[in-house]
Amino acid sequence: AYLPDAYDFQTELLEFAKARVDGGGAPIKMRLVKGCNLEMETVISSLKGWPNPIRPSKTEVDANYLCLLERGLMPENARVLHLGVASHNLFSIAYAYLLAQKYGTTGYMTFEMLEGMANHLWRAQSMLGNRVILYTPVVKNEHFLNAVSYLVRRMDENTAPDNFLTHSFNLKPDTKEWDFLAKQFEEAYAMKDHLTHVSPCVQNRNLPYTPVAPSDTMQNEPDTDFDLSQNQEWVRRIFAKWKKSGTEEPEIIPLQIGAETVVCKNRYKYLDRCQNDEVCIC
């Protein structure tokens, strides 16, 4: 939900799922999360010279989560695109529960949580009869270093000042912590129907190159963002331009040794690893 174009991704999934079900296929499932790789998105975009793709505030992220949640639980959508509500935020969980009750789509929804993060919440969910998927991290001893990044993320979530889990221990109504979290939810709820869903990532390699004016500071050209459809089309055109076939006349590049030019008449076929089973002639 931290991506502005998450709404478009949900639209694509819904269109695919509806066509699949209408054609006699089974529904698919979408797992809705708030900020699984949010920090990494910021780091990667900075290193590659791209705009930061995430929403600028936690309130906007929460609002987008509620927007996608409401859309996903509507009967016409939930029957083809089942929803996994991944959250440890009591207010978000309660909102999803009430929405599903309102729309009659409880059977198409599961709650998804992490072992050890908020065990009292998933236990309460189970007591209510809700379906809960509990994720438990498992790692072999020889791969334990791979768990460090996971543990650091969990520690960060449990200590971030705006994060629900920071205030969740011994949380009670009519306390300072409760009022703070309730206000967070109310602000997000008020914003959910007024969001724009436009990504700041608009790089387009099809456009003519515009030289950058000289400056005292050297700036690298941003890396090409191959996630963007317009850049994928740009690459396809380049590939089509230079793609060779085994039936074509090979380009002859003579070998020059000193003043002598040597042209070999032998022809050999080699597997072109860029074109699967095609061969190029040398």
Please place each PLM-identified region on the residue numbering:
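Positively charged, amphipathic and often flexible ligand-engagement surfaces
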Residues: 1-216, 222
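Short, structured beta/alpha segment
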Residues: 166-282
